[in-house]
Amino acid sequence: MKKAIIIGSGIGGIATALRLRSMNYDVTVFENNDFPGGKLTSFDLGHYRFDAGPSLLTMPHFIDELFDLFNENPRDHFNYKKKDISCKYFWDDGTKLSAYSDKIKFTKEIENILGVKQSIVSAYLLKAKKKYELTKRMFLEQSLHKLKTYFTKDLLNGVFNIFSFQINKTLNQVNASELKEPHLVQLFNRFATYNGSSPYKTPGMMTLVQHLEQEYGTFVSDKGMQNITNSLYNLALRQGVDFKFNNYVSEILVSNKIATGIKVGDKTYESDIVISNMDVVPTYRNLLKNHYQPEKILNQERSSSALIFYWGVKKEFKNLDLHNIFFSKDYKNEFQTIFENNTISADPTIYINITSKDVKGDAPINCENWFVMINSPNDSGQDWDNMIDQVKSNVIKKINKKLKVNIED
């Protein structure tokens, strides 16, 4: 039986382990922590439970697919429901808008609140869908590292339609041109942040990001996001995947440009396949330090990051939902502050995730668990202690003003 080693038990590592196991590989996952999941974990603060990392669930059928590989019923292990409202949006001028999962309801809401005709928004959404359909096979479902990918019908379709991708314009330019209405432009600009980009820099092709949310909807797990990790980890155990926790991988072993195993402490483990689920920069800098370094890739501009507060709130807010966005007044300035000044705007856009809206055990009765996230620059030596104190103060003031409360009471 061929052997496969996975470095890191994040959700990508677990999913990869399952797919290789379904192909009859003997799979071992090495993890530095003493728990699986990587960023997709949770923790408790008193009587409140919080998802520590990713908070948005789309396309859960890909999770179901992993159970299907082993003829197991996903509903026996992982359950979720579709949200009627994907996100609630709030602006400084008092404008409020609910982004419904149903496209007709969503476009009607936009027309009623912002005065933009349904036909305009529908045309915009259709363009985004076409971009996704033209690129998904090549970029999402095939490996760009395989030569055969470049000799497929999918690639030819992409080449022939390259001008429809709007790569010569920024996302903001596309949105401003096609949607015009400032609130709506800001709403669709925010999807650049899903991969840590600025809508004023990222190409117009990125309109396809929002398509996943609008086309497939937003979902919530009945036990929170960590149940994705727990259910797939337990599936992997049932299928014979071996997990080695508290094992720090110090090196990927390479022979003739082929990965042949790993080194953990003074031990070596040989394998037919080695897959790193770590981020690309630490993989090269730490695990492949004595080998070729693709400097052009490794020195690319870093994405934005996030500053997250976890607050137990002794009150329920009926006007909020699972996902909520409070926009900054000057979006362009916010991104300039992040990417050019390497700091956080005094008026940041605030994302509040409240899983207790749907998972009642996540907070005490009449209380809520708030996951409060702010876009921030990457870590480049800033005085984070001072910055965090100031941001927290600004965020609380903004929330209190918008919701007409004092959340610290």
Go through the PLM ranges and name each one.
Residues 2-136:
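N-terminal glycine-rich phosphate/pyrophosphate-binding loop and immediately adjacent elements
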Residues 91-93, 197-202, 253-260, 365-368:
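A short, glycine/Asx- and small/polar-enriched loop/turn
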Residues 92-202:
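Rossmann-like flavin
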Residues 202-213, 365, 375:
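Residues forming anionic-ligand binding surfaces in small-molecule and nucleic-acid pockets
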Residues 208-259:
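Helical element adjacent to the flavin cofactor pocket in flavoenzyme catalytic cores
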Residues 250-364:
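Mid-domain catalytic core of redox enzymes
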Residues 322-323, 334-409:
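Conserved flavin/dinucleotide-binding core of flavoenzymes
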